[in-house]
Amino acid sequence: MSSSVTTLSNFIMGTWVPCSGENLLYHAVSGEPIYAAGTKGTDYAGMLAWARSKGNRTLRKMTFHERARMLKALALHLNTKKELFYQISYATGATKGDSWIDIDGGIGNLFVYASKGRRELPDEPFLLDGNPEMLSKNGTFIGQHIAVPLEGCAIHINAFNFPVWGMLEKIAVNLLAGMPCIVKPASLTCFLTEVVSKEIIASGILPEGAFQLLCGSLGDMLEHVDCQDVVTFTGSASTGMMLKNKSSIVSNAVRFNMEADSLNCSILGPEAAPGTEEFALFVKEVVREMTVKAGQKCT
């Protein structure tokens, strides 16, 4: 392997492990190989067990407000490292303007969910679901539903076009909900996800087992999921449907959230003729959507 190629690392069961390096990743501008990624030899079942026994156990004991403060602290930390992320992002083929929505937008997601957690959720490790129900005539027997974290792990399979936003918007949700995560970024741009992940771990803000990273194949991880796990997929419809219909997903009734082949649409009303403010705004937004990230946006 060329000395100019950097081997990425996976974060597995609390340890940074150098990738097996079977997949070369190339600079989007020069075409030169710059990184090597891979997950050969990974103990996927062990990763899930680690997340469930370590991360889940700690997160589910925390209140929503504690989790929200954790997200805010993480956002503040990552905000101080943005310039590093932008420098790495150029190798993905993105300009600073392209990466603004990815990097600043991703960190912004952490701030938003931190705020929602403090403002909209109770300072408890559970959420009341509805009002108490009187189950006996004199009120000696009362029932109350509550929502609590699942006891499994959230597995995130992400797309290539938002290596930072795609990760941060998903982990913000699962961490606030009290679940650990395993992040599997798209290999094409996973080197940017990796550098952000290193800052997440270096911050020491997240509890042990709350976050793991795979820069390469997901292997047979989905063969080890159960009904307490969640899989969140962003990518093509064909790949998403293939994963969603895996026997392990279906037989264990695993929650599977899929965002696939998403397209944006701009509609101009017939009364918005050239020369109107609406027409000018329409043209401006269409140009933006066609040029930012070369049109590879999904929001």
Predicted regions and their residues:
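Short coil/turn connectors at secondary-structure junctions
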Residues: T6, V148-C153, A177-M179, P207-G209, ...
